[in-house]
Regions:
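Helix-breaking motifs and short loop linkers at transmembrane-helix boundaries and internal kinks
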Residues: 39, 77, 99-101, 134, ...
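Conserved MFS/SLC helix-loop-helix module at the cytosolic interface between two early adjacent transmembrane helices
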Residues: 64-104
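Juxtamembrane helix-start elements in MFS-like secondary transporters
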Residues: 42-55, 107, 141, 261-270
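Hydrophobic core of transmembrane alpha-helices in multi-pass small-molecule transporters
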Residues: 19, 93, 104-120, 238
Length: 280
């Protein structure tokens, strides 16, 4: 097999997968639809805050499968099967949402099922793809991550158009099936490089300081946890991520409540917000 060509197929498949699962950032479009149809869906009115908790759970569980995903590659015999698992869970979470009658069911369907699916797929598409491109690791990680953000640029207007025409629950079903099919097909092209494989003409840096950077040394995970700088870094990440996720996940109801936008315009605003998220 020509692995120099294969790696580009892996990159494209990973980008397509991340675009699909990245629509999780467009939750606010679903949330607005659920809020408007809350009486028919839940049998009573619910608040925006109660609905927003589904996205909070979806994002909050993400670290668990991301950490477990690397170990699952051995259990499931490769990254392709982990992405398949992620795609099936993500699709199942969206489709299961059409059967909900309570907020707790929403939290399980979208928050847990879809959340675990997103994280399983995302953790593999980034880490595995970078293995194919040690010569361009920063660029490739950026492209793969940007694709995750791009999902919430492309799909919000489509989501809102479907909600306006069919309602929010059929939209969950339509998109759940569509995403599942696309991810399963894309995952077929995702594989891991052979052990020790390197691109033609690439020679990796060797030695502790050369690999880690001038004046620095590599740390194992135990040493990392013992370093106070690790916790400061985590705190900075949490602060920045919290602000960003608040805006990204509530773009639609915020623009309607504060700016007086209609649902279609609010969906476009969500896409515009996602442009900044993707660019970053």
């Amino acid at each position: 097999m020509n692995w120099m060509k294969k790696r580009w197929a892996v990159l494209v498949a990973s980008v397509v997968t991340n675009i699909c699962i990245g629509t999780g950032f467009a939750w606010s479009v679903y949330q607005t639809g659920l809020f408007n149809e809350s009486v028919s869906v839940f049998g009573t009115e619910v608040s925006q805050a109660q609905l927003a908790l589904a996205f909070t759970i979806c994002s909050g569980v993400a670290p668990i499968p991301m950490i477990a995903g690397s170990g699952l590659q051995k259990t499931l015999r490769g990254p392709r099967n982990v992405v398949w698992l992620g795609g099936i869970l993500f699709s199942a979470g969206l489709i299961a949402t059409i059967f909900i009658h309570s907020l707790s069911m929403l939290y399980v369907a979208y928050g847990l099922l879809a959340g675990f699916g997103i994280a399983f797929a995302y953790g593999i598409t980034i880490g595995n793809t970078v293995k194919f491109f040690p010569d361009k690791s920063g660029l490739i990680a950026g492209i793969s991550t940007a694709a995750y953000g791009a999902g919430s640029i492309i799909f919000p207007p489509i989501m809102q158009a479907l909600i306006s025409r069919y309602g929010v629950m059929p939209t969950f079903r339509i998109l759940g099936i569509a995403y599942g099919v696309v991810i399963i097909i894309s995952a077929w092209f995702i594989t891991a490089p052979p052990e020790g494989w390197l691109p033609d003409g690439f020679t990796p840096k060797t030695g502790g300081k050369a690999a880690a950077g001038p004046g620095q040394a590599d740390k194992n995970w135990k040493q990392m946890l013992a370093d106070v700088r690790f916790y400061l870094m985590i705190l900075v990440f949490i602060i920045f991520a919290t602000g960003g996720l608040m805006v990204v996940s509530q773009g639609s109801p915020m623009s309607q409540a504060i700016g007086g936008a209609d649902a279609a315009t609010a969906a476009v605003i969500v896409s515009v917000i996602a442009v900044g998220n993707t660019g970053g």
